[in-house]
């Protein structure tokens, strides 16, 4: 659970979930609240000829679609921090429909231990909430070495759907690796890559996003939105859907996390038979099949 006051996050506290963690929450998770209120990008921006100016969402997405249409070999960096619905939207619209090369970087830091509801210790070096969601969608998961080579060896425009998808992306080296290419980044805070990007989009935080996530144990859980998006920020699923419309792969229709989840459950075997309504009222549902436990 997320405690907030006057639109600012104050603390994280554990939600009682007898099937997953009981009342317990790790200290690492508790202290993620620090810095959660940082917001340096709240409107779409366009940079050209040394100038930065505010643009509309329509204008920003049309620019990105144009980058992908007129230049060969566009690259896309997705994120294991995104919801299942966002990752499904990426797979269907950017990989399957547009034929883009997409990777999902996973940061394997120090091994962390967390006790589950049955008193068993779970060890993992995966610092992301939804690496398994990416794998289940069939999106390629890469480590930092492959992420670096993916960006350095590419020569097409780049779309980064989470400026903090991997710690390396927040470094000056990452910005230098793509300095000669058109780049668009979805972000909340400034990094060297964000500050040099051709287009910057304000992304909603996960506390401002509704959706589902697949744990390292293969349990799909629903997360409610705690706060409204700040400024003009939008969640990743909404950004990808809107971009797909500009690329001609989606028609104007009502879309929401619930709608996307239903379509995902119909098309992705691991989620078959699940419903959004049940996930909103139950502590979680196991996927069909095995999960890749990172450790």
PLM feature spans:
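N-terminal export/assembly segments and adjacent metallocofactor-ligating motifs
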Residues: 1-145, 154-155, 159, 163-164, ...
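Short, surface-exposed, charge-dense and proline/glycine-enriched linear segments
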Residues: 3-6, 105-111, 215-220, 281-294
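Broad hydrophobic/π-residue packing in well-ordered secondary structure
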Residues: 24, 31-35, 53-57, 77, ...
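Non-catalytic alpha/beta scaffold blocks inside enzyme catalytic domains
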Residues: 90-93, 97-273
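Long, low-complexity segments enriched in small/aliphatic residues
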Residues: 259-295
